[in-house]
Amino acid sequence: IPPRAARRSTTSGIADTVLKYGRQRLVLDNHRFIGNVGWRQNEQTYDAFTVVNRSLAQTTVTAGYIYNVNRVFSDESPVGNFRMNSPIFNVKYDGWRAGTLVGYGYLLDFDDLPANSTRTFGLRFAGGMPFGDDLKALYTLEYASQSDYRSNPADFNLNYYLAEGGINTGRFTAKLGYELLSGNGSKAFQTPLATLHAMNGWADGEPAWWLNLQA
């Protein structure tokens, strides 16, 4: 089936479980690893089989198998699709007052871009605690490990770190964060399915001509 001809079906006959097959939107956590690039007119969608189960208290288990990614480009573009064979899982527990704990694994096996094939496992904790009148402390900690997967010709093991702190006043939010995607001189930590513009910071916020003038 051509990627854009995929159909979608949804089943919810199993208690606390939703099954989906075909074209669908996938957004996990803060879009850092799996996102939909939703600000685009043509957002990123996934041809996949997914299972979302909430039978355990305060726990959401998402598991799936992605066989194609419909990127923000047209099907006429040579980079319009990522064909792949990629199992994913994401387990979220939000039963603690202090925050939400997430464990995840994304095993991305690209058919036509083997150098992008990676295996990523990580943990994320994010939350907030009220203090004073209408004030809330915000915090996030995340770590992930990424290595080569399947037909990737490289051999590497890289790390991802995120630490954020902030405050919310009810009307305003201010945050300060540090994010590191490590590299070894030839390979770098990759997140090809992310909502990338949301993560690129100053590198994505300046027009190229201005950067050239500063060089």
Q: What are the language-model segments listed below?
A:
Residues R23-L28, Y65-V69, G105-D111, Y143-Y149, ...:
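Transmembrane beta-strands of outer-membrane beta-barrel pores
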Residues L19, Q58-A63, F89, G99-G103, ...:
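Transmembrane beta-strands of outer-membrane beta-barrel proteins
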Residues A5-I14, F49-N53, F89-Y93, L123-G127, ...:
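Residues on the lipid-exposed face of transmembrane beta-strands in outer-membrane beta-barrel proteins
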Residues I1, L138-A215:
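Extracellular/periplasmic loop regions
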Residues I1-R71:
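Outer-membrane beta-barrel channel domains
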